[in-house]
Amino acid sequence: MFVDQVKVYVKGGDGGNGMVAFRREKYVPKGGPAGGDGGNGGDVVFEVDEGLRTLMDFRYQRHFKAIRGEHGMSKNQHGRNADDMVVKVPPGTVVTDDDTKQVIADLTEHGQRAVIAKGGRGGRGNTRFATPANPAPQLSEHGEPGKERYIVLELKVLADVGLVGFPSVGKSTLLSVVSSAKPKIADYHFTTLVPNLGMVETDDGRSFVMADLPGLIEGAHEGVGLGHQFLRHIERTRVIVHVIDMSAMEGRDPYEDYVTINQELSEYNLRLTERPQIIVANKMDMPEAAENLKAFKEKLQDDHPVFPISAVTREGLRDLLFEVANQLETTPEFPLYDEEELAENRVMYTMEDEEIPFNITRDPDGAFVLSGDSLERLFKMTDFSRDESVKRFARQMRGMGVDEALRERGAKDGDIIRLLEFEFEFID
């Protein structure tokens, strides 16, 4: 089964907890703190594997969680950093954040990697908190939670040339006679439901990859006829071969077909119209095809060349393939996303994001509810079983301006404050 879009959940590994420990050794009085730091959590990394052709594997596993770092130990022993979780994806995979709709990565080359969910930093042990005023601190940090998000994987096939046109105009037949591909061919619409790739070689030794894409109909850019699923695969092609049925046996006018398909391409993505387009008049072996071709050329406003062929009798294929190869030699690749745009999005998803420190809302019962990534991460990294850690958390909240913001919202002594699943009282 060909799967080209799937939604999955990814989570980086949590950092290991720091440790509270002291050096207890003979002849070493007042040995001081000796708690080690926790190890860093593993990242969720996507890597391109050219042996994969579909996102089928993601239908059966949709949750990917990297392992957490090892906890710190006594004698200042640092916890072991966790290994990254490497997930293989096929070339042509675009990774998008499901919430923000921002593109995280466009993976096209074999071995290319991208960090999709970063692991958390390991918590610090009590050795890190020693000061002249407090040489034996009784506090440490929990590990930082790993980044978690839902993402959408979208496969856009890698092909140099894309065959487009209405259903049943002969695209699959054309691919089958110019390459070794074996697409399903039948006399009904939407026989082709998934892209078929074939390697084409011309008589002079030039080669390229051609994709037989499912047929388009009017309204495809709005999703009609599964249009969105079909059009996404055209985006990477460098040359578009527009196949038109000149026999007009289905009652459609060839020129109207030509106009309709080009309108769908421009409505879906304006950059599709920038690609060279080769017009192919197929089924020239059928009656009235020659007359229809003459009328078609008269309606074309420009001197755009038209290649008359018959995929069944193989008439005109040599000239067509030479023209395709010539166009590929002079046509650069069309990146789906600018490098600057991708770089900006990658920066957006690092763990050092500029985030709103906190938000304050009210529950119906009058309690104040605190939220925000920075504050919640700080809360999760605090060890509330130790008094010094609790006092440090209170100082950090005060430094972030939480206390002052609560007073401005009308908080008074004894009011209930909620943060995640915990409650505590406000003390002014």
Swiss-Prot record:
Positions of the UniProt region annotated as Disordered: 117-143
EC number(s) per entry: 3.6.5.-
Function noted in UniProt: An essential GTPase which binds GTP, GDP and possibly (p)ppGpp with moderate affinity, with high nucleotide exchange rates and a fairly low GTP hydrolysis rate. Plays a role in control of the cell cycle, stress response, ribosome biogenesis and in those bacteria that undergo differentiation, in morphogenesis control.
One of the GO BP terms on file: ribosome biogenesis
GO MF annotation terms: GTP binding; GTPase activity; magnesium ion binding
Family per record: Belongs to the TRAFAC class OBG-HflX-like GTPase superfamily. OBG GTPase family.
Cofactor: Mg(2+)
Protein name: GTPase Obg
Domain of life: Bacteria
Sites where the protein binds GTP: 165-172, 190-194, 212-215, 282-285, 310-312
Self-association and partners: Monomer.
Gene: obg
Keyword presence, Nucleotide-binding: yes
Occurrences of domain OBG-type G (ranges): 159-329
Compartments it resides in: Cytoplasm
Pfam families reported for this sequence: DUF1967, GTP1_OBG, MMR_HSR1
UniProt main location, coarse: cytoplasm
GO CC annotation: cytoplasm
Domain OCT positions: 350-428
Residues covered by the Obg domain: 1-158
Binding residues for Mg(2+): 172, 192
UniProt entry tagged with the keyword Magnesium: yes
